[in-house]
């Protein structure tokens, strides 16, 4: 969406979903799901598309694929445009089976679900005889029903010459080789055609091209960015009754009270003027920027962790420059003592969401996340997805394998690729620069060149998705009102059972651009080790050391270390 806006292109937001008849009537061991193209015509349609995508994962996930049924489509059909689909659609599969009567019935069901005027019949030109056969029936049924055709391209790669790279990618996905592929496309026509190529391909049905413009004009979706969707914090009752009710204390007032208590606890009573002045300044900035609730939310789950005996880190990053965070015991680093700047953490001249990274013991991290989920509602809390891309080393090994070479062949080439620098792997462009070891090998050996040519076509492609190691999003409303969710494999628990988590379908940056509150719950094994060490000391001496009061200039300690 943002890329289109930046380049002056009107975005058309859509999703190819897997559609089934009825989740409730699904026969055991049998799963028939088909492709269906859905486009958002307006903001309501976009919200419904988000809901459908989420429900497909959260309610219809089976055998590694999400799916929605016709009842769900009808429930969320407002504002959607449905295209009859590619060869893998139910509509085309009926035609392939020589059952045009069933295809027509399915078309009627689609029109009932999203509205007659919102269904278009797809014709495609991909060089497959079965597609040409389907096109004849698609045209006939569309005209019988009085609905327009629309010319589409089933795009799987950008340029025609990318066909071979796509074939290699399919082999990577299916763990097969190019000589014996498990899945193959029979033509090289599944690329993104130019407008002239589309016009030439559908010259037989010029109305199919006109419909593409009609649909583009109908689709008008604006995604609101830059909001602050921070949940309200349930403050205690003030003059009236009930948290967050009519008599609830204002968030700013409650935060100020907690900071005042923290100032006395940290600096003594009376509070030193320097500390009071710094706290007043920070509270003013926090209030003006609308982040009172943010600090209360962080204070609350950190307090829960400490009250529950879960080890919490002393603070990391720019948040250590905040006296408010120090007084709330979010951090244990005195910014006055160490002359740390608040503006590095929260700058009134640059409006952006604050970012406090919290460290918890690995053993306790899940309990903290569970607490936050229960407090703000499981519909409003999720972990954030992350996408793993194919970088040169992995792409080289995969390319060698799909070409049928032994593992050692690809591994030898991969080892010629330099190590990542500050976490960033080098690109093939950098690896093939003059003087680089990989370039020399490619120039010397034809097999190496063939492998690297295939690997370059795989570079940058998303290989898999996983759960971000730390990031959790907390919303002021159900997340499916804002963005789609899915489930992700979180590995096995202590009993060996597979664990699945609800995660966002959007990665970190889009989540933040939508204005959602993102928190980092980092699990540090160091904290577990320290806790175990303190337990050993307590058992041996009867006293448990307080880490926050240990002297930093203890001579015997330094003598032991050096």
Spans of features found by a protein language model:
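Alpha-helical scaffold/interaction cores of sigma-54-like transcription cofactors
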Residues: 1-562
